[in-house]
């Protein structure tokens, strides 16, 4: 594989794809280009005015001066300062139009890219989030997009403004003396070779910088989210060292990029100025063939060239940083969204669930998490799944709403394979409450009436809160249902957060309710109230309960005991106790533990 050969073509392809995001702003972009044309045209104007001024001083009777009626040579010469001011104003106008309108393009591009990237996150499958840390995903939206914007707009600004300046100056120099100008043109292949060589290094280093920046964001994100654990277990030193290591790695990679640029830019300047030195030497040989004004104008125009050439050479690093950032962004955008080939949509289902010979393993694993699982849940029934951690209970619950796709077997709702429902319609029929509660930095009411539930009346929200035994503590909050609860409900207790999650599920009023350790964070009194509330709402719903505390599922119609991905027992509470198998042993173990815990209190 010849990566070095493929990389430039790949860079061009990525860059042109990136520029496609500028298309909605083509009008603004055109105005900015016009501004830079105005700006660039002012450069040779200055050299021309100096030629006119010097020739006027040395030869006041020159035809250019005497050919203007009503004014003598010196009167015309007094107009030169005004011409310089007008050229500066012309240049300022061009700079304003170019910079302002390109900034509008740049800010729009940042918004569009971030929005597109965020929208893609909402469509990606669960497995994508399992394989990518939140820190790296956040870094793409923040750091990478900023780098990409630099390539798409800031780099264009330099390429257009300085590129046009070089074109105008070269055109002027060719018009003045094409033979001398060819000496400067001769260095362009060497400059091109240097730029190509540096571009590969810049892009490679930029990829490493973005990964390192993602590591910094990841460590910071984990520490902030788990700050209670960090402080409780004395992890401050460990996290400090972990962050320092990530930050130092990022700094080293940044410095390597700076070092490459620091060597590359002066080398390019040396080549450019060497060409200028040759030109100046040749100018001395032409003293008798050109006027003093011609020589001054030529030297002035040639002297204006190194700055734009240097800036054009430096823009390579900006472009390659952006291309590397765009590469990671497009990798995410090109990742396949959740598979949704279903076509069936139903207003409401009765809630009959049938699982046939279901098997599943996580990507990259050779262990079956679920192995030939089969069962049926009739509408309105309550089914409980119990078993040791890792037996496959939560995995089974995640397969019903298609958070993952099973390898073998079928899951049917009302006789229709879940794969045949559209994802949105399937999930509308399922309310899910897990042990890991997710709340948002918003009001209590907006956390209960979230997403598709946002338009429901306040009375329905309050009724759901009451049914979830949450209204009692909500009424004690400073602004009641309008109280802001902080990031992930940080101002609430674990039990309060879980009750809000249950209220949200109850408000959804879905025919299928999945409770995955939903009452694990509740105290005994709250759990008793919740169980009573759930008992009422379960009568009209098919309910799948995953529980560790067996006392919470004794009233289930069917209890299924799972072990190593298989259902090893099923029956009612009484039947399973009488059988003396897995369930009876789990029950006896908890029966011994609970009195001991109570005595310890």
From Swiss-Prot:
List of residues binding ATP: 387-394
GO CC annotation, single: plasma membrane
Keywords: ATP-binding, Cell inner membrane, Cell membrane, Lipid transport, Membrane, Nucleotide-binding, Translocase, Transmembrane, Transmembrane helix, Transport
Keyword Iron: no
Gene3D superfamilies the record matches: ABC transporter type 1, transmembrane domain (1.20.1560.10), P-loop containing nucleotide triphosphate hydrolases (3.40.50.300)
InterPro entries documented for this protein: AAA+_ATPase, ABC1_TM_dom, ABC1_TM_sf, ABC_transporter-like_ATP-bd, ABC_transporter-like_CS, ABC_transpr_lipidA, P-loop_NTPase, Type_1_exporter
Protein name as annotated: ATP-dependent lipid A-core flippase
Species in which this protein is naturally found: Aromatoleum aromaticum (strain DSM 19018 / LMG 30748 / EbN1)
Gene behind this protein: msbA
